[in-house]
């Protein structure tokens, strides 16, 4: 919703779960809607995709966070195929951040925002974060991450989220300041 409120046009959507996709389409009305696994999207030949999807200003992705959530199974589910709620397809979820980076390599946006839970920075999951950095760097992007806390941003909940921000090497975003100091409105 933030992009919409900021006046951005939402051009496309890739979502495997029909119910989630329906809500997204109703909220954002993307010009191009791909109801499919992102792995299948990445297999579509570039010449079969709308040219508007290449060299975007911003590409945003939020790979499922259940495998990194401190409330979830974490390490026990890593690398295992399972029937998850998303699309009810048997799949692994812990590698979808890397699959999203393959999408970045395909579409070549100027800026990439990828969101996940704070748990991706904790314990053994830190290796996933390091690999995210390595993979972005290997396709010509510099990357940083910011931990944002909802209660400090005027959101009435204590949700902590990590935002990986990647840019092409010629894009200067090194001094981005995302510090918020709103009075918490949690109850």
How would you label these PLM feature ranges?
Residues 17, 37, 57-60, 94-95:
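Acidic side chains
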Residues 44-56, 66, 70-187:
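Class I S-adenosyl-L-methionine
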């Amino acid at each position: 919703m933030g992009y919409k409120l900021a006046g951005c046009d939402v051009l496309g959507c890739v979502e495997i779960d029909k119910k989630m996709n329906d809500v997204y389409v109703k909220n954002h009305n993307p010009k191009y809607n791909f109801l499919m696994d992102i792995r299948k999207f990445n297999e579509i030949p570039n010449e079969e995709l709308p040219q508007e999807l290449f060299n975007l200003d911003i590409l945003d992705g939020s790979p499922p966070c259940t495998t990194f959530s401190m409330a979830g199974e974490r390490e026990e589910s890593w690398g295992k195929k399972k029937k998850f709620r998303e699309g009810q397809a048997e799949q692994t979820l812990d590698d979808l951040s890397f699959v999203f980076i393959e999408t970045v390599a395909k579409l070549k946006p100027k800026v990439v925002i990828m969101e996940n839970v704070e748990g991706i920075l904790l314990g053994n999951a830190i290796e996933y974060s390091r690999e995210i950095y390595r993979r972005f760097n290997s396709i010509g992007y510099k990357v940083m991450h910011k931990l944002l806390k909802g209660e400090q941003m005027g959101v009435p909940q204590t949700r902590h989220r990590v935002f990986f921000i990647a840019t092409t090497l010629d894009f200067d975003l090194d001094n981005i300041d995302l510090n918020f100091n709103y009075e918490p409105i949690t109850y």
